[in-house]
Amino acid sequence: MNFDKEKCDEWEKIRLNSSPKNPFTKRNVKKDGPTYKKIDLICKHNVVGGNVVDLNKLCLKWLKDNHPNVKIPKSKSPPKVKSPKRKKSPVRRRVSSPLLTDDEDDVLNLQYDYLLSYRSVASEEITNYLRQTINDKTITAGNACMSNTKTLLKYFTNVKAVGKGSFGTVYIGNINIKNNVFSIAIKEGQISGLEANRAKKLQFPVEYLFNQMMNNILNNKMCPSFNYTYCIHFCDHCEVVSAIFKNPKTKSKITTCSVTMVEKADSDLIGLTSLDAQLSALFQILAAVHCIHKLYGIQHCDIKIENVLKKNIPKQANEYFRYSLDGVNYFVPNTGFVAILNDFGVSFSTSPKISTSYFGVRNAKVVFNNNSYKFQSFTTQRYPQENKWGKIETLSPPPRLRGPGGAKLTLNKFMKNFDSKPSIFVDLEDFQKFPTFGMYQDIQDVVRMFVGGKQTVQPGSHTEMRGLQPQAKKAILPFVEKLAPTSIWPEDKVELFLANVLIHKIFTQFGYTNAPPNAIILETYKLP
């Protein structure tokens, strides 16, 4: 039984009878019995109609209420996009009819739907469509479900489950907007009852705030390597797989889920065999990591090949994406895909503007001397640590660092409402001058994703990328390092902590800063 407005209206009229008739099967049902309750759940008779969650407005409201000092750049209105000049190819990609508005001057040519300019226009259209269309009793508080009651299914065609586990289920489905078909991903994932209750009061888990930040990076054309998030719903009775301890069999359980609708990708990074493709993937991932580190102090905490997706795009010879970073242009060849940094479920921010408590371990300052970046260590006099009741206590002096000279250096940990008494002024909002140890961990996960090694935060290990080219491996291996929070940060290895510096170290040797002759520039991105 799925939601049907006419049948639910009929149910509303007869549900209080002693033996009401099921409007879906025309059979009598026992009042307050299991079938009766299921019909009530589907029709949600006792809930006032609601609207789809507008992620942008709610996250901005959350920011304004909780962190008024955070400044997120306002997205510019999507420009009318000119198609890049391309040489004709004997292999033509199927072109859908023009999109999206009633104004013929603002059509979107889906032949170039992989460009960020087009993706931003499509995102706005899809978000508006979902907000306007999915807006009736189906999605009222806690009843927007892909599994179990399946109240959302009627809005999509060709729905397929493409991933399933204890976290929930990932679906892909199509929506039709003005005779143009778009595929989107729908993630139905388990959340706690506490998170669900907070969400209904518009107090969203921080992951949703991060999704909004990724949308802003995309809308401001800084970096294309994130998924657009369109909207978020909640389901009080979703069905997920529940693993039984010491039993190989599994069964499903009914729980509470968030249902997040996002831009669809095609696969993870498995299958990259050419040197150009491997280098392009490395550049794109490091560019995305640089954005989240510098702008928001976000530590991803789970970068691995399964969490970097791939959006396949058409390619032709001599096509490039231009990235502007620190005053230098990098020309990244179009190798047939856009890499997407995905899954911020365990991420957190150490920015004082966002974090509610922890501002990170910062053992050194980045200085620029003799045309190179170097670390300059500093010390603190006090060290915060939480007791078993969660109260911050002071440890003086702080723990010392390991290695030659470490006895004179301290482990510098910063937290909200705690003065660590540093020996120099520390700007906790400047992640380029005062990086955190977590930034090193993210970058190590990126390079180890290619050459192999232990994951830095999560349990498990990266395996070497299958088919990794010797030139790529040789370029990456020098930047694999094993540091602990109590290690002395290597003076001449700032690139281990700053993704932008690592980009320059690796990609100048492959000629990425040299403008290719007669290059077709598909799009330009201005990294922060």
Curated annotation (Swiss-Prot):
Alphabetically sorted, this entry's keywords are:
ATP-binding, Kinase, Nucleotide-binding, Serine/threonine-protein kinase, Transferase
**Gene Ontology molecular-function annotations:** ATP binding; histone H3T3 kinase activity; protein serine kinase activity
- Reactions that this protein is recorded to catalyse: L-seryl-[protein] + ATP = O-phospho-L-seryl-[protein] + ADP + H(+); L-threonyl-[protein] + ATP = O-phospho-L-threonyl-[protein] + ADP + H(+)
Domain Protein kinase as annotated: residue spans: 156-507
User: What positions constitute the catalytic site?
Assistant: 302 (proton acceptor)
Tell me the segments the record calls region Disordered.
70-96
Tell me the domain of life.
Viruses
Q: What is its EC number?
A: 2.7.11.1
InterPro entries associated with the record:
2-cysteine_adaptor, Kinase-like_dom_sf, Prot_kinase_dom, Protein_kinase_ATP_BS
Q: Compositional bias (Basic residues) spans?
A: 73-95
Output the GO biological process annotations, alphabetical, semicolon-separated: intracellular signal transduction
Where ATP binds, per the record, is at: 162-170, 187
* Matches recorded under SUPFAM superfamilies: Protein kinase-like (PK-like) (SSF56112)
The UniProt entry, under PANTHER family, shows: INTERLEUKIN-1 RECEPTOR-ASSOCIATED KINASE, SERINE_THREONINE-PROTEIN KINASE HASPIN
Q: What family classification does the UniProt entry report for this protein? A: Belongs to the protein kinase superfamily. Ser/Thr protein kinase family.
Put simply, this protein is called Probable serine/threonine-protein kinase 380R
